[in-house]
Amino acid sequence: MDEHFIRRLAKIEKLCPQFHLSLQSGCDETLKRMNRHYATKEYEIIVQNLRNSFENASITTDVMVGFSGESDEEFLKSINFIEKIRFAKIHVFPYSVRPGTSAEKFKNQISPQVKNSRTKIMLTLAEKLNSEFLASQVNKIEEVLFERPIGKFIEGYSKNYTPVLVKSDENLLGKIYNVKITSVKNNHCFGTVL
């Protein structure tokens, strides 16, 4: 996904600025063992180009921890890269051996205890970054498509797929309204319909 392609995407008015770019690891050595055909620098450039071309873009990803041979240093590199990119949301999962894959034959499989510990560390970082992203939405005015009632609220999603809750006596379901984001709580933004 080069800069020219991203600029062309940005001209599509109906395109929502939410991009899921699977990272797997933020360490080049680990990516190479995974047989991924990209490096962190290339990935970072794509993210920068998306953020330069799309206002308030949401970048989400998948991260695997405990891949065969992942050293403490490699895990730390992955943590540092993920902090640098500042994802809106991260799906974290531990590596598990898959029969028939080349990784099954790798030496230096990571113990379940280390995988569990690294998963907890990565999940803590993911929660922190998600909270920071949601907080960055406060005071913004966003178009929200309302999808379902939740208790006294109606839940919808902004163009960048941020969950937003509002109170309203009107039937907002299936409709798009401008909403001013006013606060964040429990992984949701709260707002007022304008």
Please describe what each predicted stretch is.
Residues 1-89, 95-114:
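Conserved non-cysteine loop/helix-boundary elements of the Radical SAM core domain that shape
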Residues 87, 92, 123-127:
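Short N-terminal helix-initiation segments at or just after the protein's N-terminus
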Residues 105-194:
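Terminal RNA-binding accessory module
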